[in-house]
Amino acid sequence: MNQEEWIAELKGIQPALFEGLRRMVAIPSIRGEAEDGAPFGKGPRQALDEVLAIASELGFQTKNIDNKIGYAQYGEDRPDGAYYGIFGHVDVMPLGEGWISPALDLTVRDGRLYGRGTLDNKGPILSNLYALYVLKEKGVTFDRPVRIVFGTNEETGFGCVKHYLTKEIPPTFGWTPDCKWPVVYGERGRLRVRLSVSSDKVSGLYTFANEKLLHTNHRGEELGIAYEDSDFGMMQLRGETFGVEDGRHYVEWTMCYPAS
């Protein structure tokens, strides 16, 4: 298939995507008191059940992990357990004030979608689910299964993902289509770097940090990695921290591009 044909397929699935999103937006999946079978409250549990039902209707394998998190999977398990992971969440923040249209009723107005969770994160994670559905229906295969993982506690602590990682191995590769995805995700770059040394070389570590990180313009020139362009401006280095772990001294810093 060429690009135009893929675009046509994606446009064709939009009505089904909007209907799925309507079902999800209608659920007030705000964290509540823990109950039997609903560790983060009734709303998040209901949202998890609903999104797994949607995924099942689309022909995906699904799994609910202790009512805290679940996933839809395309492709069979490998002996080594490796998979690609797309992580999102179906819990939302409280509805708040000032809604022009009903917060729990998906509204299309002037080509835009309104409703709690359309941006963070029900809309983006469902977009990935339906895009994967198109690939599945067209017979596209991958060298390992693809999972779309639906958390229920992202807004209040990530307890869902922490629990997931006690039951499942981390993905080989993946992404998080959260918030204004893919625009913001594509525009922002973050890299957290750690440099560690044994205790007998700690003097050199602090010399490096002073000369290359702390007493600089924080643009990476001393490291030979300075970069800027007209669209995103200058890369910046910041967030330097020092510590000791497992007997090794380290310095960490963040490379930010763009800086905002």
Go through the PLM ranges and name each one:
Residues 70, 112-113, 249:
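Hydrophobic residues embedded in beta-strands of well-ordered beta-sheets
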Residues 121-197:
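Acidic/histidine-rich catalytic neighborhood of metal-dependent amide-processing enzymes
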Residues 76, 90, 152, 255-257:
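Short beta-strand segments enriched in hydrophobic/aromatic residues
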Residues 80-150:
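Active-site metal-coordination/substrate-binding segment of hydrolases
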Residues 162-260:
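Midchain, well-structured core segments that form catalytic/ion-binding scaffolds
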Residues 67-68, 88-90, 110, 152-153, ...:
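Fold-independent oxyanion-binding glycine-rich loops
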Residues 62, 106, 239-242:
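A structural signal for short hydrophobic beta-strand segments in well-ordered beta-sheet cores
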